[in-house]
Amino acid sequence: MSKRVVTVPLQGGKVAVNPQFQDALKQIGLDPNAVVQRVQEELKKVGKYPVQKVEVEVVSPSKYEVKIYLPPIGDLLLKLFGKDTGAHDARNEVIGNLSFAQLVEIALLKKDELKSKTLKSAVKQLLSTCKAMGVTVDGRKAEEVLRDVDGGKYDEIINKFEKQWQQ
């Protein structure tokens, strides 16, 4: 059996079970209830972050993977803060604030898209986006936090999650 992809219908951040979705899963040999339960478990992992789409990649009836796609980082931040655009003057305007822990969490969730070799470089990439959009981190300008990351101030926090990044 070649790999098949079934898009999971979502409504309000939850699986919207409909007959077409159930039939598509049954045709592949999957139990729709088990798939829905697994998708819901995966959605819990992304918690409060908006989900762009969810797919079930099926290799065989006994082997499938749930893939959750978040919006691009800029859009993700805008949705988190309920904004339509980033700051018009990012040096002087703030559209929202993230904790450093949230920044690390987003980096881990977006790992496949960031293409960074280390969590530290992924965090730095996110900080650059925050800087351009007018997002502060722990109430401080992103460029200040970036300097602290380069200086090793956040190494303890980053190292705590590095194993998770390497998986």
Curated annotation (Swiss-Prot):
Alphabetized UniProt keyword annotations: Ribonucleoprotein, Ribosomal protein, RNA-binding, rRNA-binding
Gene Ontology CC terms: large ribosomal subunit
A biological process from GO: translation
Superkingdom to which the source organism belongs: Archaea
Gene Ontology molecular function: large ribosomal subunit rRNA binding; structural constituent of ribosome
Xref: InterPro entries: Ribosomal_uL11, Ribosomal_uL11_C, Ribosomal_uL11_C_sf
Family, per entry: Belongs to the universal ribosomal protein uL11 family.
Known function: Forms part of the ribosomal stalk which helps the ribosome interact with GTP-bound translation factors.
Classification via PANTHER family: 60S RIBOSOMAL PROTEIN L12, LARGE RIBOSOMAL SUBUNIT PROTEIN UL11M
Quaternary organization: Part of the ribosomal stalk of the 50S ribosomal subunit. Interacts with L10 and the large rRNA to form the base of the stalk. L10 forms an elongated spine to which L12 dimers bind in a sequential fashion forming a multimeric L10(L12)X complex.
HAMAP family the UniProt entry points to: Ribosomal_uL11 (MF_00736)
Protein name, per record: Large ribosomal subunit protein uL11
Organism: Pyrobaculum aerophilum (strain ATCC 51768 / DSM 7523 / JCM 9630 / CIP 104966 / NBRC 100827 / IM2)
Taxonomy of the source species: Archaea, Thermoproteota, Thermoprotei, Thermoproteales, Thermoproteaceae
